[in-house]
């Protein structure tokens, strides 16, 4: 031996490390390297720190800003800088990508405020610092004594002592600097990290020296010094790992009352053992978890921070590369821990082999060595467990960050996408350009399953399809699927990527090396089998990819269809279409189940192959070993090899699983990327930063402009282009009232959209102040108004909140202004009627309010805002005439609009135009007239009637009354300046009612999942015989495993005449190596196959060799047993999956039928997001997550049963240990299950707010962008993302908490197993003892996985539990009552009679209709009028039994409708609701969704509602519509009538049609049925007066139909047969309108006519109709009197 480090290898001799290794390495080289690295690192960091202090400080990655009203006095910024930088500086790209859309979506302004508090200093912190200093000083003293005392030189050489003394003096200096400079400006960074690292390394180095000193002491003094040194070093090491990390104060962030995260307070020991989770587990055990108790995320894990950092990373071409680039640091760290875990996975097996060799030859080594091996069994596995758990925890952190990024990006994209008018795209569908080119390379790829070999099913029709239009967009259902399912798929894969690129390769490499050492050249056939398996695995991956694409495409279609059904459930119920639409959804569901079936077939085949591979490796290796090489297969060789083969199977399983899931995630990430690549709105480019023209003047104008909906090259199927605005050149008057008029479908709404930048600009310029975020615009200090826009959509858009929040829309609350707006928008009376005043929750899209109420709240929101410019789209159409008068006079022309621009689309020309300042008249996409109001009126552009009226009146005359009509401001004062401040405007009437405002919050179950939930799923899978067959298959599969173990033992024993065999447990390496992920992520087949490996294989060392063994016989039998096991595994999976699909089909059908047949009230109080959560994520869990876990649970339970039987028969004494271990596991499970199930339920519940917000945003994106409020919605989205991620990350923290503790208990089992082996030498037969112990270790592992899988099963059954909750919602009456079916032609006459009818929305509420009695004769036309809350809509609901009678009854043709089935009733009568409801499809599918009418009938109905003009030619049934070709130049083009082609596309909710066109289409749908009773709820509110007049003529021609019209336009019903006036749910008046108008001043109808300002016109129409009716009656009487 020469100099230092020249020791000879091996360094382990018999029972100890060599003195050379201890001296050269443990005393000199390794400590010197550690100190050198510390000094270099300190020097580098100190220099960089000094350099950074000389520069100006850089801004944090996201700068927190005020969050409006959420800020609190004394709040501090949340810019807590994390300890380590998440992103390398060279990856940052200035601020590129942070500001989206002119800064409107800038993440740098989306952080919220929070309170920062200093964490309490631990009580023993000061004492620990003193003890640390004393311990280091003691170590210095030890080395001084060793240096001075010659007796210590045995263990302390001179060089080693000097190095040691230098080390501890250096550490003493560092510790002192930490103590005195920790809180000063001279603080040296990361000193604690240095001291802790040195303590840890020194402790590890000393372990070997300490054992050597105890086993072979050189001298008494040296032994004492080593003991003292080891004790003091151990003290420092354990102090370092058990005290809080770092040498600085920890700051905790309190945000909105949410408890801060505690992870950053944890010590190293607490972090690695997840002891910091104890508090969560204990809290969950004591009482159910609620969201308010769930800790917050760490600041660096919050969505805003993650997204901000992510967008700073340089973008790459592909989304997955961008994500990998961002997470490269975390992935490398995860890989490091995974490699460590993979290395230590083999340690227990090799230690057991060493123990068995000692058992065979006890004299071969000292007893102390084997006890060292026994101690190392649990120690090495604890190290493996620490690495494994750390890698998985890092993966979980990556997972939540990926989910935050993807959901955040999808939401931001939803705010930037074009306003949808085109057709839907299928995300993930194969594009032509993606097809691989032909050629040799392509063929090779195809052979290796690397190419695109999954042809599209309808690829044969591909040539017929046109190129994809640039206006193709993902529909709402698809986007919700991207957010809920695809982002989940991708994020889950990222949790386990280390299995693919670190863990599995490491284990494969180590197992191959060890196998080669054991078998030599005979291991090569096994390696060849492994290599040949790779293409097979890739093939399975491609198959998974293909099936997953189909599943996602089918799922998109089903969810979109379900979303449409639930969105439009009211019209579906009115028309009794539930069963028909359910069948339509079921068809899509069948396609989805078919795709799932294909995936499960692939999965089962993959499982069979993966189970067969280890058998093939074993077979061919043993075949070569015994028959080619002619070597005896000794037990030691056989069982060591089999143990390694089983070890080898685990990474192979991981690789197969991960390849499949990576392929599935690739499908999802491609779909997300395709959505993120969709065309975006060019609104921000069109509007720019300001609305200043070339002269520097602010204007609102469209200059020489042309616009189109969708892309510039959008061509429809018939060759026509999308709707366009042509030759638009107009400038609106700022600060004045501007009116846009024109017939239905002329382009009025499109003109507003063009102003807002929502249409595609073909040429020209747009001037409007809407290009900047509202938060960036400062209001004028004098007027309080800002240069921003407010927009009121034609179809009112409200968020799921209370009325007050909808009006404030995050603006600061000003009580006086708020009250003035309430009065001006005629909302006082409504707030008095509503249970909770303005605290009433209005539900998604305002579903609990009438159309007029929603429209007025939307108007109030715009008026209350500080926007200087208001764009109002027909906001008066949904209110009655006198309310319209009031709003126009007191709101639109009132003091609240002073100095504000109002651009208003309206059909109420007589009311609005005469008092406007500027008028624009549209027709067919062009401006036909514009100018001052009087000029346009007198030109006749608005009709001769108003022109004549204008000539006879002065422009200043107004018929609007000066007082407040009683129907609007009753009891609330007559002036906007009233400041009495009645509490009912802003507060509920009383505390009891206030509780009702929370009715729409989603509930969650508590406690364990109940048996009825389990029973629902199990019974859905199959009857008793299904489970009998399943039990037989599972038992057979388990039996094949046991028989194979016994057969190997029998074969190996043939080579010896005397055997002392103790098995190497194949499960000893398995403790937690397959840590659980959600079953969607890591298939449970892996777990089940782990169980097969765990059940033990014996190894025996022969004493006398018997060479006369028929190896071929044993090989063949072994192969048969193995193939039988693989076959049963295949059948097992296939059978359970078959049952799973059956259950999925049954549960979905029941859920759909139950929800569609729920009462109307259910849809009023349940947000769409909650319902869609059940149909998407919960249903996906039922489809794909429950069944694999069921397989795992049954396998573990059988494994435990087999283990207990074997142990009881071989070593009954071990049952005592098993009892205590089981008790420990049960206690762990009890604590874990209590907290984990609640956290899982909270995570499920917190998905709904995300669903809800996505739905709201998608339907209201135009309004959000118009207000410039995207940033607030992004902020809200990030908060909701955090809300979902909070319970999720702590759920997985409890999972890791369980994993480490169960691993620890398993290590105790292995430890005692080793002790048992040593103590039992010569007492029991070694072979059977080995099998018993092998199964004993498997017993602990089986219980571990049973606990884990049962926990996951409970979490998955939470989805079934939530679905079951919906299966029990209150149902409507039966669709058909066989005993009370009406006649087939009922109603033949059409008479309707109410007899003392009373009803209410709920039993505990006041009646909405009281003792209503009246009769409508056959073929009569009756108008229903009354002020808001009078009961008009309730009466219509009552006719359709949407409200059931509390008293009285309704008769139609003398039949009590309460006694017949709902389908019989609703199919016999028809309603046209106020809100038009259309479905994605075509005009034909919307009018006649079930193909009941001919094209001629459909065209006739379109003509009757004026959608096809009298001068337009209706195409014949056998000819395509002949439409004029559209000129290519915009100037000469014109818009075509799309209604001439029944195949014209209708977008989601009819978004490509105007509101008026939608109403007319719905009316046409109703007229097609030619009903005997027709109810019209303000069905023509959004239609211009001229068209409305023609439609009324059509309705009057319906002589055989009884018509009940709820009207706001009194002109509509002035000539009806009767008018019913309601007030507070009671009949006030009921007679002919002329008779009611003659009552005088006291009549309710008369006062309404007076308020409308058109009394003369109404009286004239009513009298004319009255006289005509009298003549008819006289004629009828004369006819009756004639003989």
Swiss-Prot record:
Record key words, sorted: ATP-binding, Glycoprotein, Membrane, Nucleotide-binding, Repeat, Transmembrane, Transmembrane helix, Transport
The UniProt record lists the keyword Ribosomal protein: no
ABC transporter domain boundaries: 700-949, 1392-1649
Domain ABC transmembrane type-1: 338-664, 1028-1351
Region (Disordered): 53-93, 451-473, 952-998
Claim: Glycoprotein is one of the keywords in the record: yes
InterPro entries in the cross-refs: AAA+_ATPase, ABC1_TM_dom, ABC1_TM_sf, ABC_transporter-like_ATP-bd, ABC_transporter-like_CS, ABC_transporter_C-like, P-loop_NTPase
Domain of life: Eukaryota
GO terms, molecular function: ABC-type transporter activity; ATP binding; ATP hydrolysis activity
SMART domains named among the record's database cross-references: AAA
Subcellular location(s) of the protein: Membrane
Membrane topology qualifier: Multi-pass membrane protein
GO CC annotation: fungal-type vacuole membrane
Positions with biased composition (Acidic residues): 81-93
Sites carrying sugar chains: 247, 489, 545, 956, 1097, 1277, 1396, 1411, 1541, 1552
Sequence intervals crossing the membrane: 24-44, 127-147, 157-177, 190-210, 221-241, 336-356, 368-388, 496-516, 518-538, 602-622, 632-648, 1016-1036, 1111-1131, 1182-1202, 1204-1224, 1304-1324, 1327-1347
A Pfam family the protein falls into: ABC_membrane
Binding site for ATP: 742-749, 1426-1433
Function text: ABC transporter; part of the gene cluster that mediates the biosynthesis of pyriculol and pyriculariol, two heptaketides that induce lesion formation upon application on rice leaves but are dispensable for pathogenicity. With the MFS transporter MFS1, is most likely responsible for pyriculol and pyriculariol secretion and thereby may contribute to intrinsic resistance.
Family assignment from sequence similarity: Belongs to the ABC transporter superfamily.
Protein name listed in UniProt: ABC transporter 7
Organism: Pyricularia oryzae (strain 70-15 / ATCC MYA-4617 / FGSC 8958)
Gene field: ABC7
């Amino acid at each position: 031996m020469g100099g230092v480090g020249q020791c000879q290898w091996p360094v382990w001799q018999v029972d100890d490390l060599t003195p050379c290794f201890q001296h050269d390495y443990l005393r000199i080289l390794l400590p010197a390297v550690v100190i050198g690295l510390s000094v270099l690192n300190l020097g580098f960091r100190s220099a960089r720190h000094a350099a950074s202090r000389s520069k100006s400080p850089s801004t944090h990655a996201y700068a927190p800003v005020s969050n409006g009203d959420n800020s609190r006095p004394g709040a501090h910024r949340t810019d807590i800088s994390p300890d380590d930088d998440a992103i390398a500086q060279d990856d940052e790209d200035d601020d590129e990508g942070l500001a989206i859309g002119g800064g409107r979506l800038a993440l740098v302004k989306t952080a919220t405020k929070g309170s920062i508090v200093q964490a309490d200093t631990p009580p023993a912190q000061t004492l620990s610092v003193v003890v640390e200093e004393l311990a280091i000083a003691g170590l210095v003293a030890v080395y001084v004594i060793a240096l001075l005392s010659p007796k210590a030189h045995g263990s302390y050489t001179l060089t080693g002592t000097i190095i040691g003394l230098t080390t501890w003096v250096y550490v003493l200096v560092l510790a002192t600097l930490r103590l005195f400079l920790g809180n000063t400006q001279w603080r040296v960074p990361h000193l604690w990290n240095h001291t802790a690292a040195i303590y840890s390394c020194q402790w590890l180095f000393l372990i070997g020296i300490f054992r050597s000193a105890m086993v072979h002491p050189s001298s008494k003094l040296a032994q004492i010094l080593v003991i003292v040194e080891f004790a003091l070093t151990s003290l420092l090491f354990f102090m370092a790992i058990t005290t809080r990390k770092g040498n600085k104060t920890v700051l905790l962030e309190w945000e909105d009352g949410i408890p801060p995260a505690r992870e950053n307070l944890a010590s190293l020991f607490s972090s690695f053992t997840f002891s910091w989770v104890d508090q969560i587990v204990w809290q969950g055990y004591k009482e159910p978890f609620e969201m308010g108790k769930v800790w917050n995320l760490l600041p660096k894990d919050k969505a805003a921070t993650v997204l901000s950092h992510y967008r700073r990373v340089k973008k790459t071409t592909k989304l997955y590369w961008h994500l990998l680039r961002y997470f490269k640091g975390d992935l490398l760290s995860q890989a490091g821990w995974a490699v460590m875990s993979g290395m230590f996975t083999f340690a227990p097996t090799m230690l057991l082999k060493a123990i068995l060799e000692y058992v065979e030859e006890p004299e071969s080594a000292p007893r102390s060595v084997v006890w060292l091996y026994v101690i190392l069994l649990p120690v090495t596995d604890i190290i493996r467990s620490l690495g494994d758990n750390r890698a998985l925890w890092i993966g979980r952190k990556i997972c939540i960050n990926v989910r935050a990024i993807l959901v955040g990006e999808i939401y931001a994209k939803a705010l930037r996408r074009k306003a949808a008018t085109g057709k839907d795209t299928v995300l993930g569908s194969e594009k032509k350009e993606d097809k691989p080119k032909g050629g040799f390379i392509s063929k090779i790829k195809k052979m290796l399953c690397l190419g695109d070999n999954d042809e599209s099913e309808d690829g044969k029709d591909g040539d017929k399809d046109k190129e994809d239009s640039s206006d193709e967009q993902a529909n709402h259902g698809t986007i919700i699927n991207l957010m809920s399912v695809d982002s989940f798929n991708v994020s889950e894969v990222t949790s386990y990527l280390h299995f693919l690129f670190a863990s599995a390769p490491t284990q494969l490499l180590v197992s191959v090396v060890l196998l080669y050492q054991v078998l030599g050249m005979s291991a090569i056939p096994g390696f060849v089998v492994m290599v040949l398996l790779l293409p097979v695995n890739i093939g399975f991956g491609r198959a998974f990819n293909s099936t997953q694409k189909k599943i996602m495409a089918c799922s998109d279609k089903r969810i979109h269809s379900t979303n449409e059904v639930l969105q439009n459930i009211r019209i579906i119920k009115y028309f009794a279409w539930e069963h028909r639409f359910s069948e339509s959804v079921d068809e899509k569901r069948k396609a989805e189940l078919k795709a799932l079936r294909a995936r499960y077939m692939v999965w089962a085949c993959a499982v069979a192959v993966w189970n067969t591979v280890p058998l093939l490796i074993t077979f061919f290796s043993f075949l070569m070993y015994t028959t080619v090489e002619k070597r005896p297969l000794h037990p030691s060789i056989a069982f060591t090899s089999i143990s390694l083969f089983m070890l080898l199977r685990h990474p192979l399983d991981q690789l197969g699983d991960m390849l499949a899931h990576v392929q599935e995630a690739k499908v999802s990430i491609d779909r997300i990327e395709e959505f993120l690549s969709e065309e975006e709105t060019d609104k921000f480019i069109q509007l720019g930063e300001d609305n200043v023209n070339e002269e520097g003047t602010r204007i609102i104008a469209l200059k020489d402009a042309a616009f189109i909906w969708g892309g510039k090259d959008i061509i429809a199927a018939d060759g026509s282009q999308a709707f366009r605005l042509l030759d638009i050149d107009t400038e609106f008057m700022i600060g004045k009232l501007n009116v846009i008029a024109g017939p239905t479908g002329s382009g009025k709404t499109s003109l507003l959209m063009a102003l807002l930048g929502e249409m595609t600009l073909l040429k020209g310029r747009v001037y409007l102040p809407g290009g900047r975020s509202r938060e960036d615009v400062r209001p004028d200090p004098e007027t309080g108004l800002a240069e921003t826009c407010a927009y009121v959509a034609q179809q009112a858009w409200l968020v799921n909140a209370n009325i007050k929040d909808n009006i404030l829309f995050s603006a600061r609350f000003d009580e006086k202004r708020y009250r003035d707006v309430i009065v001006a928008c005629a909302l006082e009376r409504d707030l008095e009627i509503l249970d909770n005043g303005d605290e009433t929750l209005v539900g998604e899209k305002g579903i609990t309010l009438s159309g007029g109420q929603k429209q007025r709240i939307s108007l109030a929101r715009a008026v209350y805002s500080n926007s200087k410019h208001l764009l109002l789209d027909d906001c008066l159409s949904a209110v009655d005439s006198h309310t319209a008068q009031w709003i126009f006079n007191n709101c639109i022309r009132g003091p609240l609009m002073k100095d504000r621009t109002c651009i208003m689309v309206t059909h109420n020309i007589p009311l609005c135009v005469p008092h406007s300042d500027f008028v624009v008249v549209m027709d067919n996409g062009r401006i036909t007239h514009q100018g001052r109001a009087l000029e346009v009126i007198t030109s006749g552009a608005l009709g001769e009637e108003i022109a004549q009226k204008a000539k006879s009146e002065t422009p200043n005359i107004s018929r609007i009354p000066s007082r407040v009509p009683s129907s609007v401001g009753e009891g609330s004062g007559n002036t906007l300046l009233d400041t009495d401040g009645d509490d009912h405007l802003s507060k509920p009437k009383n505390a009891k009612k206030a509780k009702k405002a929370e009715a729409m919050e989603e509930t969650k179950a508590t406690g364990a999942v109940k048996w009825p939930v389990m029973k629902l799923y199990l019974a859905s899978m199959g009857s008793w015989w299904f489970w009998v067959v399943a039990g037989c298959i599972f038992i057979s599969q388990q039996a094949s495993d046991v028989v194979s173990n016994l057969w190997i033992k029998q074969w190996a024993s043939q080579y010896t005449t005397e055997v002392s065999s103790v098995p190497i447990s194949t499960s000893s390496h398995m403790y937690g190596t397959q840590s659980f992920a959600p079953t969607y992520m890591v298939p449970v087949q892996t777990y089940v196959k782990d169980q097969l490996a765990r059940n033990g294989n014996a190894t025996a060392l022969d004493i006398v060799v018997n060479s006369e063994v028929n190896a071929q016989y044993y090989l063949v039998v072994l192969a048969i047993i193995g193939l039988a096991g693989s076959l049963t595994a295949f059948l097992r999976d296939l059978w359970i999956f078959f049952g799973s699909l059956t259950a999925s089909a049954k549960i979905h059908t029941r859920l759909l039928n139950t929800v569609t047949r729920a009462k109307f009230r259910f849809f009023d109080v349940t947000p769409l997001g909650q319902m869609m959560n059940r149909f998407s994520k919960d249903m996906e869990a039922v489809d794909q997550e429950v069944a694999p876990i069921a397989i795992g649970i049954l396998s573990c339970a059988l494994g435990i049963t087999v283990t207990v039987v074997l142990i009881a028969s071989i070593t009954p004494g071990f049952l005592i240990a098993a009892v205590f271990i089981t008790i420990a596991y049960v206690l762990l499970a009890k604590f874990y299950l209590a907290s984990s199930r609640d956290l899982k339920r909270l995570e499920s519940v917190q998905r709904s707010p995300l669903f809800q917000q996505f739905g709201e945003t998608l339907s209201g994106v135009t309004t959000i962008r118009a207000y410039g409020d995207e940033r607030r919605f992004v902020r809200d989205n990030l908060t909701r993302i955090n809300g979902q991620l909070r319970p999720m990350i702590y759920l997985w923290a409890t999972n890791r908490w369980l994993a480490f503790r169960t691993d620890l208990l398993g290590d105790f089992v292995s430890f005692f197993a080793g002790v048992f082996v040593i103590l039992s030498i010569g007492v029991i037969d070694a072979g059977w003892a080995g099998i018993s112990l092998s199964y004993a270790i498997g017993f602990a592992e089986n219980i571990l996985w049973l606990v884990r899988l049962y926990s996951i099963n409970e979490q998955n059954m939470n989805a079934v539990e939530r679905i079951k909750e919906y299966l029990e919602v209150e149902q409507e009456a039966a669709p058909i009552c066989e005993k009370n079916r009406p006649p087939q032609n009922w109603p033949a006459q059409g008479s309707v009679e109410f007899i003392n009818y009373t009803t209410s929305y709920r039993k505990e509420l006041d009646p909405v209709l009281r003792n209503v009695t009246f009769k409508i004769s056959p073929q009569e036309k009756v108008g229903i009028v009354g002020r808001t809350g009078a009961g008009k809509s309730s009466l219509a609901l009552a006719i359709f039994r949407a409200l059931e009678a509390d008293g009285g009854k309704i008769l139609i043709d003398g039949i009590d409708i309460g006694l017949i089935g709902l389908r019989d009733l609703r199919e016999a009568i028809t309603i046209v609701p106020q809100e038009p409801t259309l479905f994605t499809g075509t005009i034909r599918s919307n009018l006649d969704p079930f193909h009941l009418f001919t094209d001629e009938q459909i065209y006739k109905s379109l003509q009757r509602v004026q959608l096809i003009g009298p001068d337009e030619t209706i195409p014949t049934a056998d000819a395509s519509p002949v439409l004029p070709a559209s000129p290519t130049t915009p100037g000469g083009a014109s818009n075509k009538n799309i209604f001439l082609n029944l195949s014209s596309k209708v977008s989601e909710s009819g978004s490509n049609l105007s509101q008026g066109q939608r109403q007319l289409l719905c009316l046409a749908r109703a007229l097609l049925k030619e009903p005997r009773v027709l109810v019209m709820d303000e069905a023509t509110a959004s239609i211009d007066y001229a068209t409305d007049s023609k439609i009324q003529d059509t309705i009057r021609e319906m002589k055989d139909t009884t018509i009940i019209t709820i009207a706001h336009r009194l002109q509509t019903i002035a000539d009806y047969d009767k008018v019913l006036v309601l007030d507070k749910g009671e009949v006030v008046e009921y007679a002919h309108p002329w008779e009611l108008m003659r009552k005088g001043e006291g009549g309710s109808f008369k006062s309404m006519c007076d308020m409308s300002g058109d009394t003369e016109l109404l009286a004239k129409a009513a009298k004319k109709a009255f006289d005509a009716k009298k003549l008819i009656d006289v004629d009828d009487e004369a006819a009756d009197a004639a003989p």
